[in-house]
Amino acid sequence: MTEPVFVKGEKALYGPKAEPALIDVPPMKFFMIEGVGNPNEEGGAYQQAVGLLYALSYTVKMSVKGGYTPNGYFDYSVAPLEGLWRMADGSAGVDYDRKSQFAWTSMIRQPDFVTDEVFQWAIAEVRRKKKLDAVAARLATYAEGLCVQCLHIGPYSA
């Protein structure tokens, strides 16, 4: 049986070219956490959220090694971290001089076999094994739709 295409086989979505391109991003499942604050703050809300997202994602990926096999499971690579950024006060654009006012949604894409049941199992495992509070995490489908994809090279503040 061939492994379903997941992230690595989707170059149009995860392999931007040097020239901007119009792409249509289909609805996809993600583990998501929302918050506000400077992403560079040591031990801050953003860094904690990223740690929790990876803990949940790797718990699902490694589930078969622990004796739990979700229905439809296939081996895959954990998807890259993605994020949505805006200002907490609703102002247009992003003001890099006010990083403490960044509102963010950090997310890691999940395979289609990740259901609410699998998500709840992963939350329980992360609480039990890693002692992490996963109350802020959620499983949701995000539909980006038609957008422009462009490759940015350089610092985030540029």
Predicted features along the sequence, with ranges:
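A solvent-exposed interaction/effector surface
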Residues: 1-158
